[in-house]
């Protein structure tokens, strides 16, 4: 949802939009809660409170002050990520298609011949990093840029088997127009750019697990972050390959040679980071014009020094000349060298050309060895061709996509490789590597061993759920790692599937109850964003590939109403209640009936079951930004940090009742996942609360009334306001609590309206208006370790007779309380108080 705050109303009506006017009788938190549970996507918030907007944004719900109709129109028609700390809106808006335009934030693409293969009459526009160059399009009171681009389509094409780019792009655009917006992909880059600067500033050592190419620019600024990926393809791994011949396959219609060079250099940079944790000087020989240097320097500043007879316009220092062996002495330590020397073939006969290429390969390799032979802190990436070669067994083979698969590949070497054992690799084996292996990631660091690291902050976004990881190891890491941000795939199946398919692999699935943490926040993507100064206009879908975000060691853990809070907890319930249910009271009625409470008079105000817990369980797929386990735990240890809002503390038994209702709901819906989740939450409640039951009571609290509007034959008709199991020396403690609640007890609005048979031979009158006070008293007894209440639900009633009688219905009648007393069962009254 998105909340657009205005000082005055607008005449125009928008689809999927509700209006909310600030309620001055409620505080900012209560207004935020009410707004978050509205059911439309767009909320126009009039006479707004800035504090309410802050609360919504911290909850991950985008809420923005609007100063003009143009701002309103722009934000109401598309989704976006909002940096509420810096007042920057990142639109995810593809309406630029109506200009016959596709967009990119990679400059090198604009220097290719890609426009020859676009849809007829279409053009390519460069918009800068995250759409930074579009800021001039929006003259708004907040900074605004459109981060939507088509780079995902272009990059997917490069790695696909498709050759016809126009048809590929047409299909992908049509898919984009008919499926839901991939909001997480668009928003994730904004999130990463906010997340990692904060982590590096706060923590000495940061580990990042499973980065992919989407993050390759983000981490250029962070050489100290240790990356873990799937590992490199080593020379020694070629032993598994069978010999093949030259294939000669076209990969892309437009020239992507620059993409290949960029990926090679960035791979080399990250290998250098892994070894030395600092930025290198970047030396490049050949590969002009290297327009991609502009892209790298848009994200992070490097010193590029290049040699090539052709211009290299974005190099820091360019030598418009050839590079020779004698020039190696000019290269400094703490550097990387990229060797991409290859003479143009021209009209040379292919046999003669092959001899030239093989000689250049030997020379290139010799340059690499000489560069690495002296000095320190060096890494080299060198172009080679498929031929009989002796190569270090530990060297890394690279084959990033290029325009055509021919005979070239690249070798990544460091100082240790040069001194390692060399192995003879036949030409046919290298052709087999070239023909069958594509390097699909610039991060080639070793795989992460799933174990705790107490001195590190571990980040693992979308990286650990794969079923080739041991599920128990993942759980153990999350349970024991002191500081981390880890995601795992949420179990949003209906059959409680332990793993689900994703692309060509399987992911383990998880529920919050799979983890045993006491200092971690478990939330959704949008809930996590709120903790890092961001919010989003589109929440995660209830089905599909969604993840739990688990933050260990966060300083926001105790701020229960500010982060991963209960905003939106009833939104799904409201959607169903007013569109599909038999009555808008369906939820209340079901919760009471499923706990054998058949008095439904005033069911929407006389709550005996926690609606929060019930909704958090049965609709967890929609509202898992709310960290239910944390909410339960902090209440159980009485460390709830509440800043504001209408606060009601549930008695633990109310939470148990909610679990029982949720289990019955799950059985009726055949929802095995909710059934397990509700069972495990009930077990968790019993674990963190020391709940005892007076199922064999020896005392009770009774309430006598001045007026009983029914015929009765018992000696003293009374309301049993709870039973106790106590020792005699605890009586003073019970009396003290009763006295402390005297005003509230006598202030109850107690009513009755009918009689019924509670069971065979027990004729009773119903009682309404006492449950809220009962549960408050329950809490006081619980905190004083006094056993109060039974395991079955408390059903308030007045016993009238021990004979069977017909039901009588009367007008709702107020009962006047005469006295409240503590009495021993089959014994004496120990305490009695009147108003």
UniProtKB/Swiss-Prot annotation:
Annotated stretches, region: GTase/RTPase activity:
556-692
**Residues of the active site:** 718 (for 2'-5'-phosphodiesterase activity), 720 (for 2'-5'-phosphodiesterase activity), 797 (for 2'-5'-phosphodiesterase activity), 799 (for 2'-5'-phosphodiesterase activity)
Listed A to Z, the keywords are:
GTP-binding, Host-virus interaction, Hydrolase, Inhibition of host innate immune response by virus, Methyltransferase, mRNA capping, mRNA processing, Multifunctional enzyme, Nucleotide-binding, Nucleotidyltransferase, RNA-binding, S-adenosyl-L-methionine, Transferase, Viral immunoevasion, Virion
What domain of life?
Answer: Viruses
Q: Residue ranges of region 2'-O-methyltransferase activity?
A: 246-428
Predominant location of this chain?
A: virion
- Record-linked CDD domains: capping_2-OMTase_Rotavirus
User: Where is the protein situated, by its record's location annotation?
Assistant: Virion
Q: Name one GO biological process term.
A: symbiont-mediated suppression of host innate immune response
Q: Which E.C. number(s) belong to this protein?
A: 3.1.4.-, 2.7.7.50, 2.1.1.56
Region annotated 2'-5'-phosphodiesterase activity, chain positions: 693-835
Region entry N7-methyltransferase activity, spans = 171-245, 429-555
| Matching InterPro entries | VP3_Rotav
Could you state a single Gene Ontology molecular function term?
A: mRNA guanylyltransferase activity
* Alphabetical list of HAMAP family matching this protein: Rota_VP3, Rota_VP3_A
Protein name, per record: Protein VP3
- Organism of origin is Rotavirus A (isolate RVA/Human/Belgium/B4106/2000/G3P11[14]) (RV-A)
- Organism phylogeny: Viruses, Riboviria, Orthornavirae, Duplornaviricota, Resentoviricetes
């Amino acid at each position: 949802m998105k909340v657009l705050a205005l000082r005055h109303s607008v005449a125009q009506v928008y689809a999927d939009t509700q209006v909310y006017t600030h309620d001055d009788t409620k505080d900012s938190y209560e207004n935020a809660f009410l707004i978050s549970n509205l059911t439309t996507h767009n909320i126009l918030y009039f006479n707004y409170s800035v504090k309410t907007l802050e609360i919504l944004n911290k909850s991950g719900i985008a809420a923005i002050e609007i100063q003009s109709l143009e701002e309103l129109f722009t934000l109401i028609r598309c989704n976006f990520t909002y940096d509420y700390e810096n007042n920057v809106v990142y639109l995810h808006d593809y309406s630029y298609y109506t200009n016959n335009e596709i967009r990119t934030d990679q400059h090198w693409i604009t220097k290719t011949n890609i426009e020859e293969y676009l849809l007829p009459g279409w053009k390519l526009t460069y918009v800068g990093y995250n759409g930074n160059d579009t800021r001039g399009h929006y003259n708004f009171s907040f900074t605004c840029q459109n981060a939507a681009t088509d780079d995902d389509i272009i990059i997917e094409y490069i790695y696909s088997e498709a050759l016809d780019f126009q048809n590929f792009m047409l299909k992908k655009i049509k898919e984009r127009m008919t499926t839901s917006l991939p909001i997480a992909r668009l928003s994730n880059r904004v999130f990463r750019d906010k997340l990692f600067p904060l982590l590096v500033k706060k923590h000495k050592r940061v580990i990042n697990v499973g980065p992919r190419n989407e993050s390759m620019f983000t981490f250029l600024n962070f050489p100290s972050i240790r990356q873990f990926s799937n590992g490199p393809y080593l020379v020694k791994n070629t032993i598994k390959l069978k010999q093949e011949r030259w294939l000669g396959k076209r990969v892309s219609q437009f020239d992507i040679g620059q993409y290949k060079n960029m990926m090679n250099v960035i791979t080399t940079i990250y290998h250098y980071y892994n070894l030395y944790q600092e930025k290198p000087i970047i030396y490049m020989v050949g590969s002009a014009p290297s327009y991609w240097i502009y892209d790298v320097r848009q994200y992070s500043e490097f010193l590029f020094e290049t040699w090539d007879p052709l211009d290299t316009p974005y190099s820091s220092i360019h030598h418009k000349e050839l590079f020779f062996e004698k020039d190696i002495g000019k290269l400094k330590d703490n550097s990387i060298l990229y060797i991409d020397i290859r003479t143009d073939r021209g009209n040379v006969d292919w046999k003669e050309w092959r001899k030239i290429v093989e000689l250049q390969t030997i020379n290139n390799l010799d340059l690499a060895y000489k560069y690495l032979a002296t000095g320190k802190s060096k890494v080299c990436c060198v172009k080679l061709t498929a031929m009989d070669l002796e190569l270090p067994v530990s060297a890394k083979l690279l084959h990033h996509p290029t325009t055509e698969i021919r005979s070239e590949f690249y070798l990544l070497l460091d100082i240790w490789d040069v001194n390692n054992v060399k192995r003879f690799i036949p030409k046919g084996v290298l052709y087999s590597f070239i023909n069958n292996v594509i390097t699909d990631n610039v991060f080639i660091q070793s795989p992460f061993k799933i174990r705790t690291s107490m001195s590190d902050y571990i980040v693992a976004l979308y990286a650990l759920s794969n079923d080739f990881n041991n599920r128990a190891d993942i759980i153990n890491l999350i349970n024991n790692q002191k500081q981390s941000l880890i995601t795992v795939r949420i179990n949003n199946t209906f059959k409680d599937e332990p793993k689900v398919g994703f692309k060509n692999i399987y992911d383990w699935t998880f529920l919050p109850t799979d983890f045993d943490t006491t200092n971690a926040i478990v939330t959704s993507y949008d809930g996590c964003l709120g903790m890092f100064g961001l919010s989003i206009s589109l929440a995660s879908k209830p089905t599909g590939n969604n993840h739990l975000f688990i933050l260990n060691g966060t300083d926001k853990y105790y701020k229960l109403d500010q982060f991963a809070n209960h905003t939106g907890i009833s939104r799904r319930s409201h959607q169903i209640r007013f569109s599909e249910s038999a009555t808008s009271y369906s939820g209340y009625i079901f919760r009471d009936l499923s706990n054998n409470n058949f008095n439904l008079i005033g069911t929407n105000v006389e709550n005996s079951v926690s609606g929060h817990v019930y909704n958090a369980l049965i609709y967890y797929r929609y509202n898992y930004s709310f960290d239910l386990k944390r909410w339960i735990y902090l209440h159980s240890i009485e460390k709830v940090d509440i800043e504001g809002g209408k606060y009601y503390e549930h008695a633990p038994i109310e939470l148990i009742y909610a679990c029982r209702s949720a289990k019955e709901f799950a059985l009726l819906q055949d929802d095995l996942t909710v059934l397990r989740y509700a069972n495990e939450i009930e077990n968790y409640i019993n674990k963190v609360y020391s709940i005892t039951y007076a199922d064999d009571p020896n005392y009770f609290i009774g309430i006598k009334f001045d007026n009983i509007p029914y015929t009765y034959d018992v000696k003293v008709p009374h309301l049993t306001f709870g039973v106790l199991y106590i020792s005699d020396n605890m009586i003073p403690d019970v009396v003290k609590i009763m006295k402390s609640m005297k005003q509230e007890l006598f202030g109850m609005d107690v009513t009755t309206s009918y009689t019924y048979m509670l069971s065979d031979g027990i004729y009773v009158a119903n009682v309404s208006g006492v449950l809220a006070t009962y549960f408050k008293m329950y809490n006081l007894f619980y905190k004083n370790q006094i056993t109060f209440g039974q395991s079955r639900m408390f059903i308030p009633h007045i016993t009238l007779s021990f004979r069977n009688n017909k039901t009588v219905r009367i007008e709702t009648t107020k009962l006047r309380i005469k006295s409240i007393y503590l009495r021993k069962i089959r014994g004496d009254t120990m305490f009695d108080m009147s108003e």
